[in-house]
Amino acid sequence: MLPVAVVALSLLGSASCFAQKPVRVYILSGQSNMVGMGDVTGRSSRWGKQFRDPVVSIYSGKYSPKADYDKLTPVESKKLASIGGTRPTPFPQGGTAVLRGFVKMETDGTYGFNPGYQASSYNIMEVAGQEVYRREPGKQAVRTGFPFTGGKTYPFKVTFLTSQANGLGWVGRTDIPGTLATLVKQDSKFPHLVDKQGQWTVRNDVTYKGVISAVGQGPLTVGLQGNTIGPELQFGHVLGDYHDEPVLLIKASIGNRSLGWDILPPGSKRFTFKDRTYAGYKDTPSSWIEGQPKKKVNWYAGKQYDDYVRAVHGVLDKFGSLFPQYKQQGYQVAGFVWWQGHKDGNPAHAGRYEQNLVRLIKAWRTEFKAPGAPFVLATIGFGGWKMDGPHLTVAKAQLAVSGETGKYPEFKHNVKTVEIRGFWRGVEVSPRNQGYHYNRNAETYMLVGNALGQGMVQLLKNRK
C-alpha cells in the first residue's frame, strides 16, 4: 500500500510554517521513460464511422429544458452525409438542433464522449436513453461512460443548448487497462491521487518544473505533462510527505538518449571495442574505424549531458523569478534521481555503463555543488525478470553502483539503486504494445516513482 499523500498545503497550515527553510530541490534525469510515458487515459479520436444514419432536426425557438423534443414536430430535418471528421456536413441554422442516429463500437468496453467543439460543446448527449455527457453554459462538462458490447448498435441523441451546433465530436474508451484513470477510478489503486469529488489532487507543497521536454510547471498533479505521467508523480508525493519544507522537482530528460554517447559525462575517455574506437567526452562521431574517414554528425559525446546541465542551471539561476513565493527562502539541492538505460542496450555501451554511471554520479554532484547529496536510481526493467543480453548487463551495472554493495565505498549510504523488474506489466493489462515504454502502463511508472521516493527517504535518513 502506497503512503496516503497530503493533498494541499492548506491542509498543513499556512505557508508561513515554511519560512526561512530552504526549498528542497530534486534533480531528475534520464531518457524517455523519465520523461514519462504512462498513459493517464486512453486516446480519443474524432467521430467517424462509428456513427450511422445521422439526422439533425431543427425545432422552433431557443432550447427549453421543459420541452420534450422527441414529441415535438421539427421545423426541418436533414439527413447528414457524415458527422465527425474535420468537415462534418453543416447543420441548418436557427432554432434548437437535435442530432439523432446510431453508434456502434467494434470492441467491448466503456466509452466516453465529447460532443461538439468550443461553442458547440454546450449540449446533452444520450446513448440508448442514458445521459453520457452534459455541459450547460457557464459550467464544466459532466461525463458518464457507457458500456458497449462490441458490434452492437445503439441509438444516440445530442441536444444542443445554444444556437451553435455541429457534428464535431470525440470518443474514446475509458476503461483501458493500465491507464492511470482506470487504475485509480475503477481499480481503486493509488487513492491519494483523487479527492472526494473524484478530481485529481493537487500538491501545493510540491512544485514541478520540466525542462528540455515534459516542460510543464506548477503544483504537482496529474495533467502537467498532458496525458502521460512519469515517476516524478509518486516520487513527489513521497518526498512531499517526508519534508516539512516545500519541494521542487526539476526534471531534465528527453527520449532516445544513451549514457554511452549522448549523456556521456565529462572525463570519459575513448575506448576500443572490437574494431571500432568509441567516442570520449566531446568527441564525434559516436564511433569510427581508425584510419578511415569519420562520419560527420551534428552532435558530440556528452552533448545531452551539457544540455541537461545548462537547462537545470537555467532554472536555478532564475529561482526567485520562477518561484517568487519561495524567493526569500532560497533552495538547497537535496538529491538526484536517475532512470535511463534502454538506448545503451548494445554490447559496446552496455559494457561501459557501470563506469559511465559512476562518473555521472560524481559529475552531477560536482556540477551542482552538492557533494555527497543522495543519488537514487532505478534499474531498467524491460521484459521483467526475463531480461537478457546487453540490457541485463546494463541492469547489473546499475545494481553494482548501489552503496550497499560495497564496491564503491564513497557511495555507501548516499547512492541507492532500486530494482524495478518486478514492476513490468504485460501488454494484456496495458494500454499499448510498446515494450520500450513499459507498454505505457501507468502502474509501472507509479511503482517506480514510489520505489525511487522510498529509496531517497532512506538515504536522507542515513544523513541524520
Which residues does each PLM region occupy?
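Positively charged n-region of N-terminal signal peptides that target proteins for export
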Residues: 1-4, 239
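Alpha-helical interaction segments
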Residues: 8, 81, 101-103, 329, ...
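Sec/Tat signal peptide C-region and signal peptidase I cleavage site
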Residues: 15-19
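Extracellular/secretory pathway-exposed regions associated with glycan biology
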Residues: 22-24, 28, 33-36, 46-175
